[in-house]
């Protein structure tokens, strides 16, 4: 199949030779054929040598690379890529595990499918497009997904209203089922059940990327008073309860998130009085709280989504962690995270270091955390390592 062509400026092919999956607009010398948003194009060097093919889009990232081979991007291509993604999840033990039917099947660049996210909750796949190309290819992707996953996937929900690039010249799209409909919205993670709000919830309905970190927290919870800030649907809260916490308090500014947290706690621990939830701004809650907590989780939403917001984001992380350090009991544990892609590991550690120094407390790092294996990082795309976390012992 012949695709329209993008030609690079001299020397701008070097990142593609290192298999980085993005072509920036500033690297392009000319475009032949006037490709539309989301159309597949072939990319050539200034010497007219083929180097990659991918989805074309107006914006800073002009091409998201699908292949470094000259091949048709057809049904067979999608089947091959999804099969590789499935094989990895089988190797990780997250697919086919009776104690866990929640996992990420496709993680964008990490699975060589930039712009595509697919999370699985029991028999429902929630598909999210972050590029015009993946949006336009959603039906062929859904067909390939059915072929690869078989009866494992009985429902496919497409949720991209808020993730598609606003500059893309796309017709308005609505969230909705591409296959099936009205499935049960209860899934399981490490033997714990939870409701998934894929219709209106954040991301695909649940923060799948914290599965292993929640399991680690469970090991530290016994006999402790736990505070789960920015709790969303309460994932860390009910792991802490299963781990034997004395009490667990969950805080989120969203009343709907608090309702979901209470539902999930009741689903796993009906009648358990150890848990209490608060619909309140996190900073205000930290200002008024006492020193009764000896295990605190700080897992805020992304403080920065663009590099021009980085400085303010780092100040926000410092302020948030400083408040937690100030009121921590001696011998307390802090789980603190950043999910901002533009905040790298060293930036985040420096922000937490500053907060610790301001508090005057003795602080030691017990664990350095990241995303789980079903959120793989393409070694040629280090930007994909977005989740950073530290487990700290505070004297």
Segments (PLM) and residue ranges:
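Non-catalytic accessory regions of SAM-dependent methyltransferases
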Residues: 1-122
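Non-catalytic substrate-recognition/targeting regions of SAM-dependent transferases
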Residues: 106-119, 135-207, 385
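Conserved class I S-adenosyl-L-methionine
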Residues: 223-232
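Conserved SAM-binding loop of SAM-dependent methyltransferases across substrates and taxa
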Residues: 233-246
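Conserved SAM-binding motif I beta-strand of class I
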Residues: 247-252
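S-adenosyl-L-methionine
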Residues: 256-297
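Mobile active-site "lid"/loop adjacent to the S-adenosyl-L-methionine
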Residues: 293-323
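C-terminal catalytic and target-recognition region of SAM-dependent MTase-like enzymes
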Residues: 333-395
């Amino acid at each position: 199949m012949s695709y329209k062509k993008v030609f690079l400026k001299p020397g701008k092919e070097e990142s593609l030779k290192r298999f980085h999956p993005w072509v920036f607009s500033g690297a392009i010398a000319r475009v032949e054929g006037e490709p539309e948003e989301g159309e597949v194009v072939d990319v050539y060097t200034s010497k007219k040598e083929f180097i990659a093919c991918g989805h074309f889009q107006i914006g800073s990232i002009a091409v998201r690379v699908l292949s470094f081979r000259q091949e048709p991007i057809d049904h067979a291509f999608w089947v091959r890529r999804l099969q590789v993604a499935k094989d990895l999840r089988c190797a990780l033990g997250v697919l086919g595990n009776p104690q866990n039917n929640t996992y990420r099947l496709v993680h964008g660049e990490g699975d060589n499918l930039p712009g595509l996210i697919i999370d699985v909750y029991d028999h429902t796949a929630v598909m999210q497009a972050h590029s015009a190309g993946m949006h336009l290819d959603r039906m062929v992707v859904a067909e390939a997904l059915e072929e690869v996953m078989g009866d494992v996937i009985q429902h496919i929900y497409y949720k991209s209203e808020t993730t598609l690039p606003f500059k893309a010249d796309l017709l308005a799209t609505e969230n909705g089922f591409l296959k099936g409909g009205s499935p049960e919205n209860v899934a399981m993670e490490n033997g714990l059940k939870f409701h998934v709000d894929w219709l209106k919830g954040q991301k695909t309905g649940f923060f799948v990327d914290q599965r292993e970190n929640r399991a680690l927290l469970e090991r530290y919870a016994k006999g402790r008073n736990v505070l789960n800030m920015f709790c969303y649907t309460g994932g860390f809260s009910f792991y802490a309860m299963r781990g034997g916490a004395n009490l667990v308090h969950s805080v989120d500014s969203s009343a709907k998130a608090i309702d979901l947290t209470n539902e999930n706690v009741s689903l796993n621990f009906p009648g358990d009085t150890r848990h209490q939830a608060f619909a309140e701004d996190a900073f205000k809650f930290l200002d008024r709280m006492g020193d009764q907590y000896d295990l605190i989780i700080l897992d805020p939403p992304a403080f920065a989504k663009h590099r021009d917001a980085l400085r303010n984001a780092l100040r926000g992380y410092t302020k948030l962690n400083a408040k937690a350090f100030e009121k921590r009991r001696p011998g307390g544990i802090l789980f603190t995270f950043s999910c901002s892609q533009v905040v790298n590991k060293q930036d985040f550690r420096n922000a937490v270091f500053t907060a610790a120094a301001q508090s005057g407390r003795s602080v030691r790092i017990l664990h350095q955390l990241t995303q789980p294996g079903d959120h793989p990082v393409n070694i040629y795309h280090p930007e994909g390592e977005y989740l950073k976390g530290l487990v700290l012992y505070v004297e």
